[in-house]
Every structure is written in structure tokens, then in C-alpha cells.
Regions:
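N-terminal alpha-helical targeting/anchoring segments
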Residues: 1-32, 50
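TRNA-recognition modules of translation machinery and tRNA-sensing kinases, especially anticodon-binding
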Residues: 28-221
Length: 221
């Protein structure tokens, strides 16, 4: 279907570049300590014996990980923290959604057909979600929503699944580009004329999390 292969039209303010090296710097927050003191996340976790790659490979294969003890607790705490901030301070409504969806849902959020090779397909023509955006967005698919009830703001924490077939040659060290991971996702259903304002608002919501954790970051375009 040719229509399914036509991408969304970028906003006219989006810069044109050959790849991420030509992204534009917008702003940053915080200070990064000297690189000579920085260790990778997997090195720190292995030294503390709170992560297990070998056992994960034994039971599931490559690109899986087992979190142990304080690291498993940290993951749970961060998920709860982010959900609380987004629901109590940022105005999002929390949902618990399915991680298995039908093919229409995958097409409806642009995962298919372009990213087919990066998805996990089940035998019954259902799919494991690569992000809870698929489930959250499709809650309103084929629906007519009263203009006055917008915006709708959804947040969910789910397991996400990605085959990462296109990740060959990219950074896959440690917990990067895993087949299974947990993610807190924000979705806004918004009036078209307010889309850019809502995008800025969502970026601000994400920034708030990093600021509360005192983590340095950059905003790029």
C-alpha cells in the first residue's frame, strides 16, 4: 500500500541534515564531571554485582539483562517516581495497557511497514509493542473526540520489545539496544493548531524529570 509508505511531513522549522551530526544545539542543563572520572553503567553495575548478563544470555540469548538487588529496586523506584511526577505535576492520566496488539495498531502508529524487521511478531498476527505509544495512541483510534475535551494526556509504564535488526554496527554495549526494556511513555491527543505548543510542553515534562534527578542533559533539534 503506497499510502502506508508516505512519511509524516516534517514541520517547516525542522533543519535539514544528512544525519544526527548535523542536529542543532538548543540548550543544556547541569555540568558533566571530568571524563577521567566517568565509568560506563555496565562497569559500575558489574563491580557492584547488581547486573547479570551471562545468566540472561543463558536463558534468553543476547541483548537481554537481569537486574539484581539494588538495581532492580532502583528501576522500580524510578518508574514510580516518573509516573508520580507526570500524573501529579504534569497533568497526565496513568494507564496500564496491553503489550500485545493487533496489526492495525502497529500500522496506526507508523511501526509498520517501515520498521517491520525491528518488531517481534507473534504467530497469530499479533505483535509485541516496541513502545506503549502504540497501545496508548490506539485507545482513541477510529474515534470522534469532542474538541472541548482535548487535550488528552496519557502516561504508561510498560515492557517494550524490539528486535533491533537494524542495529548492526551500532553501540550495543551494556544495557543499550536491548530486546526487552521498561519505558515510561507520554502521549498527548491534541488540537492540531496547538501541536507545537504541546510538543514544547512534553519536552519540558521530560526535562523536569532529569532536573529533579540532577542529571545533565542537552536539548537538540
Amino acid at each position: 500500500n503506497i499510502l502506508m509508505s508516505i512519511p509524516n511531513i516534517p514541520d517547516e522549522n525542522i533543519p535539514v541534515g544528512k544525519d544526527e551530526t548535523e542536529n542543532l544545539f538548543i540548550k543544556d542543563y547541569g555540568k558533566i564531571i571530568s571524563k577521567k572520572y566517568i565509568k560506563s553503567h555496565d562497569e559500575i553495575a558489574e563491580n557492584l554485582n547488581i547486573i547479570d548478563f551471562e545468566t540472561a544470555v543463558k536463558i534468553s540469548g543476547s541483548r537481554f539483562v537481569i537486574l539484581k538487588d539494588s538495581l532492580a529496586k532502583l528501576e522500580r523506584a524510578l518508574i514510580s517516581f516518573m509516573l508520580d511526577v507526570h500524573t501529579q505535576e504534569n497533568g497526565y492520566k496513568e494507564y496500564s495497557v496491553p503489550v500485545i496488539v493487533n496489526e492495525d495498531a502497529m500500522y496506526g502508529t507508523g511501526q509498520l511497514p517501515k520498521f517491520r524487521e525491528d518488531q517481534f511478531q507473534l504467530n497469530n498476527n499479533q505483535w509485541l509493542i516496541p513502545t506503549s505509544e502504540v497501545s496508548l495512541t490506539n485507545m482513541v483510534s477510529n474515534s470522534i473526540i469532542d474538541y472541548e475535551k482535548l487535550p488528552l494526556r496519557f502516561v504508561a509504564s510498560t515492557q517494550c520489545f524490539r528486535a533491533e535488526a537494524g542495529a548492526a554496527g551500532k553501540d550495543t554495549k551494556g544495557m543499550i539496544r536491548q530486546h526487552q526494556f521498561t519505558k515510561v511513555e507520554l502521549v498527548s491527543i491534541i488540537q492540531p493548531e496547538f501541536r507545537l505548543n504541546e510538543l514544547d510542553r512534553m519536552v519540558g515534562c521530560a526535562e523536569l524529570i532529569l532536573q529533579k534527578l540532577d542529571l545533565p542533559y542537552r536539548v537538540m533539534l
